[in-house]
A protein has these predicted regions:
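Short beta-strand->loop micro-motif that forms the acidic, two-metal-ion catalytic signature
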Residues: 46-49
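Conserved H-loop
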Residues: 33
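Catalytic core of pol beta-like nucleotidyltransferases
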Residues: 1-26, 36-41, 51-106
């Protein structure tokens, strides 16, 4: 569903997240229009980022990465950080359920 250029951007994003968070990064899931394949050229990249912990400093790093990608590659990353524990505690959350059903694990 994702094209070669989108894959390159997402691979770079995954590498940067792994570099910054190491083992604390559990999973990245692309969801929304780019995962479904009904995006427009201006669509953002909706990414659910699952981490061992989410603190203000973690959110600041994620915001910095998103800003860097906007500057370097002219793409908008809409990053939603969630703790792994939150995901397990909310198995019936409609938003999370939909993100996992339509999503692509990176």
């Amino acid at each position: 569903m994702i094209n070669k250029n989108e894959k390159k951007i997402l691979d770079l994003f995954g590498q940067e997240m792994r570099r910054c968070f190491g083992d604390r990064l559990k999973r990245i899931v692309l969801f929304g229009s780019r995962a479904r394949g009904d995006n427009t050229p201006d669509s953002d990249y909706d990414c659910l980022v699952i981490l061992g912990e989410v603190s203000p400093s973690v959110k600041a790093i994620i915001d910095e990465i998103a800003g860097d990608f906007l500057f370097r590659y002219n793409v908008v990353l809409s990053i939603l950080p969630k703790m792994e524990e939150e995901i397990h505690d909310q198995p019936y959350n409609p938003f999370l359920k939909n993100a996992f059903q339509e999503g692509i694990v990176l």
